[in-house]
Amino acid sequence: MTRLLGIIRIRGYAGTPWYIQDTLKMLRLPRRFNAMVYEDSSSIRGMLKIAEPYITWGELNEEGLKLLLTRLHTKIGNLKITDDILKSQLKIESYNLFVKKIMDGEIKLHKLDDYFKLPIRLHPPSGGFKGKINRPFSVKGEFGYRGEKINELIKRMV
């Protein structure tokens, strides 16, 4: 089972240095409150370190991934994911099997842009952010690494 990282952009583009903008484009996070799911690797960790003041990330569990996938829509028809859509496009029998294959690393969500609209668009967190978005999470802020607590933020943003 591979570790999946949920990455959410929490700050806008005004005043962003060019190299951070390029990194955010590579991570496919063009706007505020966009989210992507990647497998944990050294190249992704390097990009996260560069773009740290503009994003927050952590390890996804199965519940957090299911919540994120509820916001995923098909490219053709703008439909939410159902078992019928998964059968016709990806030849996968059920939604739960789809989630399991992503968690096991058999399917990479960021490579399914032929079928789905990526990045995943989220709402601002209900109740607002608990800290300042220009402070690290470790100092009662919002940006940077937050571990398993990313799932709580996703729950509030879906």
Curated annotation (Swiss-Prot):
InterPro entries: Ribo_uL30_ferredoxin-like_sf (IPR036919), Ribosomal_uL30 (IPR039699), Ribosomal_uL30_arc (IPR005997), Ribosomal_uL30_euk_arc (IPR035808), Ribosomal_uL30_ferredoxin-like (IPR016082). Disulfide bonds: none annotated. One of its GO terms (cellular component) is cytosolic large ribosomal subunit. It holds the Pfam family Ribosomal_L30. The keyword Nuclease does not apply. Keywords: Ribonucleoprotein, Ribosomal protein. SUPFAM superfamilies: Ribosomal protein L30p/L7e (SSF55129). It comes from the Archaea. GO terms for molecular function: RNA binding; structural constituent of ribosome. Part of the 50S ribosomal subunit. Belongs to the universal ribosomal protein uL30 family. HAMAP family: Ribosomal_uL30_A. This is Large ribosomal subunit protein uL30. It comes from Sulfurisphaera tokodaii (strain DSM 16993 / JCM 10545 / NBRC 100140 / 7) (Sulfolobus tokodaii). The gene is rpl30.
